[in-house]
């Protein structure tokens, strides 16, 4: 991957490994969308658009030769730069076990937030509709644990009516979930009751959304399409610091909105 220019960086193999490993650790916990949507690819840096399998006919009816354009989603290319102190990185070679990578860590969190923003809320300029865009798939939910369980049962009833199989997953705002746990009563934990309702699915708490949604994880309904997966490259050297960047190319497609239900508190 020459475009990353990693071989030009004044960094050792051990330093690159530490940077990559730390970024991977944070991405693993902060990429909430990837915990329940299908991930396709990566198809490579040159993959510029994802075909939608449709043709928009643009020719007139009276034309002998009919023609149109194939529909596709252009990939979003993101790039976020950060700097690291070279002397601090050299401390890694001296045996220091916990070098300061705070600039990297903060940038990784911002990149993860951007990807999740596209998955949940979409990106109008790139033609992406996010999961929360489908207001017609919304049901109201009260503020008690009983209300939550009833809303999940209603959501599953809608899935059954629409022929959407499970397992099902509850994606819920972290603070909302904590408040439900505080209010739960009885000897049987709320978490267990919810998991039983979801029929083999799971509970994902996230700060990315204000309310909640129930989704089917049967597969094929929500696709995160990757060209170049999250990667770190070299940009420049600034005296005693090195400027690096995180890049990714991707798009997101809701293939079947019937596989999600929004819960509005």
Swiss-Prot record:
GO terms for biological process: intracellular iron ion homeostasis; iron ion transport. Residues 184-189 are annotated as: Pore-forming loop. FMN binds at residues 79-81, 87, 235. It is found in: Encapsulin nanocompartment. Keywords: Encapsulin nanocompartment, Flavoprotein, FMN, Ion transport, Iron, Iron storage, Iron transport, Transport. Its cofactor is FMN. InterPro entries: ENCAP, Encapsulin_nc. Shell component of a type 1 encapsulin nanocompartment. Assembles into proteinaceous shells 23-24 nm in diameter with 2-2.5 nm thick walls. Cargo protein Flp (ferritin-like protein, may store iron) is targeted to the interior via its C-terminal extension. Belongs to the encapsulin family. Family 1 subfamily. PANTHER family: PEPTIDASE U56 FAMILY, TYPE 1 ENCAPSULIN SHELL PROTEIN. This is Type 1 encapsulin shell protein. The lineage of its organism: Bacteria, Thermotogati, Thermotogota, Thermotogae, Thermotogales. The gene is enc.
